[in-house]
Amino acid sequence: MSMSSSNITSGFIDIATFDEIEKYMYGGPTATAYFVREIRKSTWFTQVPVPLSRNTGNAAFGQEWSVSISRAGDYLLQTWLRVNIPPVTLSGLLGNTYSLRWTKNLMHNLIREATITFNDLVAARFDNYHLDFWSAFTVPASKRNGYDNMIGNVSSLINPVAPGGTLGSVGGINLNLPLPFFFSRDTGVALPTAALPYNEMQINFNFRDWHELLILTNSALVPPASPYVPIVVGTHISAAPVLGPVQVWANYAIVSNEERRRMGCAIRDILIEQVQTAPRQNYVPLTNASPTFDIRFSHAIKALFFAVRNKTSAAEWSNYATSSPVVTGATVNYEPTGSFDPIANTTLIYENTNRLGAMGSDYFSLINPFYHAPTIPSFIGYHLYSYSLHFYDLDPMGSTNYGKLTNVSVVPQASPAAIAAAGGTGGQAGSDYPQNYEFVILAVNNNIVRISGGETPQNYIAVC
């Protein structure tokens, strides 16, 4: 058996191959020496997580409430919502064809809307649709399992239980939702709370009610009937679920006295990201397979997210496929056999001129995110069109000012599977009864927050 070998002197042969192309690529006064590391010093700081104080309202299902952003820290880096989901038991008096489960992406769909305000001026907002899209295109596979655990995609919550069974556990299950506000994207755009002594800063939440999040099915209801059943307190469950402790946590940076003193000495403009969601519109492929939807966004749009949501069950918020989930015993298949993308191709129109003409959904679901997003969704029905070379990058890398455009519209052509499922003729479980859809589109845009004690230009968000 031969032994592996190598020697140092052979490396000098490589060094001797230096020629014209190497002169272009290597050397010179600005060349980097990879074997002598230069330390990039930072200012002195520390970071600490703290819970934010409740300001208004009651943090409960179906309620609006808010927390105050403390100015005790110098920079606000990240915030996250921590919720205790209570156990829910399906009545044991029901037949064994009934099953109960929480909706997929529970923490996403608990949020009807979240906003951050400065003296009641909304600086940024997002909803459950943005949470779905943002996580689908930005959370890498290495973090996906952990993220699913945080937002409630765990078997004890989303797998159906039979009569007498309980969702969750005694004492409830604690879930955590990272709140994707602009200041959490990078420490360079952290919110300088210590420089905002005259602002009342709040994070506001609008929670969905529990009956919009719990799903009851009865497998005895056979097609063309829908298996979804409205939940009646006292018949299906003994009492309405009540959230356990709810907190908003914030991670602050605390800096030196010298840096803190400099924070308020000059005007500072911060390039931020905002989310715009167009009103949802019914999508009825049986009667119109190529509907035209006007989209009225503003500012510098860097990315468009869109999908057709399957709303056959009102509580299935995160289903963007042609079929409804199929429950079999204690499991649920969210993408059953015969489940496809409801959109075959999409046309984007500016001023009666095609910006994109009948581009296949594989472009928006695979090709565009492959080149312009951190990750490709592993789920059916998510679509991205990025004007930016890399939409997750904070630096400007491409955008289009929709405020300068008029008559912008999008035409999502229905797929044959969507047409068949809408008529209840899909032929497979989950699409063998009529499916209902709606079109969802949202945009991520850039804007500027100006932090100043003086006047603010008209097109700026003033945070004085």
UniProtKB/Swiss-Prot annotation:
Protein transport recorded as keyword: no
Domain of life: Viruses
Subcellular location: Virion
Keywords: Capsid protein, Late protein, Virion
GO terms under cellular component: viral capsid
KW S-adenosyl-L-methionine (keyword) present: no
Post-translational modification: The N-terminus is blocked.
Record-level Gene Ontology MF annotations: structural molecule activity
Pfam (any one): Capsid_N
Biological role: Major capsid protein that self assembles to form an icosahedral capsid. Represents around 50% of the total virion protein mass.
Family label: Belongs to the NCLDV major capsid protein family.
Description of how the protein assembles with itself and partners: Homotrimer.
Protein name: Major capsid protein
Organism of this sequence: Tipula iridescent virus (TIV)
